[in-house]
Amino acid sequence: MTGGGKSGGKASGSKNAQSRSSKAGLAFPVGRVHRLLRKGNYAQRVGAGAPVYLAAVLEYLAAEILELAGNAARDNKKTRIIPRHLQLAIRNDEELNKLLGHVTIAQGGVLPNIHQNLLPKKTGKTGKNASQEL
């Protein structure tokens, strides 16, 4: 038997192999974040906890934006999130707008806003007409 090992081709101890993402209870890939941190020349060394923490933060931000965008889509009676819904979600949330203030979203449009000076003047009805409107 050539090239054999007692584990049948699998690495030793891989019987119950578990990804770092599943260990941390995350959907975002911890291994990929770790690789990108190493390849990005941000520092000479990357600790073991840094990619887990960063993946958790990225997952939280994505979930927050998608939840608000889903609400915007539902308000517009749509079942699919489009860039317009992302734009509305981000710009209507104070903290996300501050974080992504200089980000341009393609096909996002602008927030509906009419300046106060352009609105028609409200004429206040006073006198006996106002008292008879009960």
Swiss-Prot record:
The nucleosome is a histone octamer containing two molecules each of H2A, H2B, H3 and H4 assembled in one H3-H4 heterotetramer and two H2A-H2B heterodimers. The octamer wraps approximately 147 bp of DNA. This is Histone H2A. In contrast to vertebrates and insects, its C-terminus is not monoubiquitinated. GO terms for biological process: DNA repair; heterochromatin formation. Phosphorylated to form H2AS128ph (gamma-H2A) in response to DNA double-strand breaks (DSBs) generated by exogenous genotoxic agents and by stalled replication forks. Phosphorylation is dependent on the DNA damage checkpoint kinases mec-1/ATR and tel-1/ATM, spreads on either side of a detected DSB site and may mark the surrounding chromatin for recruitment of proteins required for DNA damage signaling and repair. Gamma-H2A is removed from the DNA prior to the strand invasion-primer extension step of the repair process and subsequently dephosphorylated. Core component of nucleosome which plays a central role in DNA double strand break (DSB) repair. Nucleosomes wrap and compact DNA into chromatin, limiting DNA accessibility to the cellular machineries which require DNA as a template. Histones thereby play a central role in transcription regulation, DNA repair, DNA replication and chromosomal stability. DNA accessibility is regulated via a complex set of post-translational modifications of histones, also called histone code, and nucleosome remodeling. InterPro entries: Histone-fold (IPR009072), Histone_H2A (IPR002119), Histone_H2A/H2B/H3 (IPR007125), Histone_H2A_C (IPR032454), Histone_H2A_CS (IPR032458). The keyword Acetylation applies. A motif ([ST]-Q motif) lies at residues 131-132. It comes from Neurospora crassa (strain ATCC 24698 / 74-OR23-1A / CBS 708.71 / DSM 1257 / FGSC 987). The record marks K121 as: Not ubiquitinated. The keyword Cytoplasm does not apply. Belongs to the histone H2A family. It is found in: Nucleus; Chromosome. CDD domains: HFD_H2A. The modification Phosphoserine is found at S131. Keywords: Acetylation, Chromosome, DNA damage, DNA repair, DNA-binding, Methylation, Nucleosome core, Nucleus, Phosphoprotein. Signal peptide: none annotated. PANTHER family: HISTONE H2A (PTHR23430). Pfam families: Histone, Histone_H2A_C.
